[in-house]
Amino acid sequence: NKLSKLKKKKNTFIKLSPEISDENLEYICNVSMNEEFISGIILTNTTISREMLYKKPMNDSWKIKEIGGLSGPPLKNLTNSIIKKAYEICKGKIKIIGVGGISNGKDAFEKISIGANALQLYTSLVYKGPNVVNDILEDLSNKIREKGLENVNDLVGKNISYE
């Protein structure tokens, strides 16, 4: 296997689509845990599905008909369920970067609590600007202290409610 002969010099993450099946998620998690050159997985990328948009009243019906990748808040629940499954499979043996629907400290707290070691933002940066990062970090830090945790690492995978 040529890939396993690579020396681990840089962190390498595999970014997965929210359309991934449970079977493929389990396979990729197992491969990632057993390959030295893979540091972790990124869950998840944009989706081409619009299914979650039909569940809410939509003032912007054009979003349902739009083609291309959908990102941001509509992905939050789907992404969270995939992160939770991956964490249960991997049991903390590889890093998980949570992506999709992170707009505030509560969203960040939830993703970390179900298993994400780190987070990636995009849509909230576009709509709220770079200060959203400070807002998220401040709220997250306050909530971690409120829950009696020493640091963010103590939250990873603990399934602690934000409320």
In which residue ranges do the predicted regions lie?
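Extended, intrinsically disordered, low-complexity segments
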Residues: 76, 138-163
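Catalytic cores of alpha/beta
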Residues: 20-35, 87-92, 102-119
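Short beta-strand/loop segments at the ligand-binding rim of alpha/beta enzyme cores
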Residues: 5-18, 88-98
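Glycine/Thr-rich beta-alpha phosphate-binding loop at enzyme active sites
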Residues: 33-34, 38-92
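Outer-membrane beta-barrel porins/channels
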Residues: 12, 19, 26-27, 31, ...
